[in-house]
Amino acid sequence: HVVAAITALKERGGSSHQALKKYKAAN
């Protein structure tokens, strides 16, 4: 799950950092 999430974030690019923070907060 984590790898898939990171891959999706990399594809988005710009909002990856913000999305990663949100993802970490969710877990």
From Swiss-Prot:
The keyword DNA-binding applies. It comes from the Eukaryota. One of its GO terms (biological process) is nucleosome assembly. The keyword Nucleus applies. Keywords: Chromosome, DNA-binding, Nucleus. Pfam families: Linker_histone. GO terms for molecular function: DNA binding. It is found in: Nucleus; Chromosome. GO terms for cellular component: nucleosome; nucleus. Residues 1-27 form the H15 domain. Belongs to the histone H1/H5 family. Histones H1 are necessary for the condensation of nucleosome chains into higher-order structures. This is Histone H1.3, embryonic. It comes from Parechinus angulosus (Angulate sea urchin).
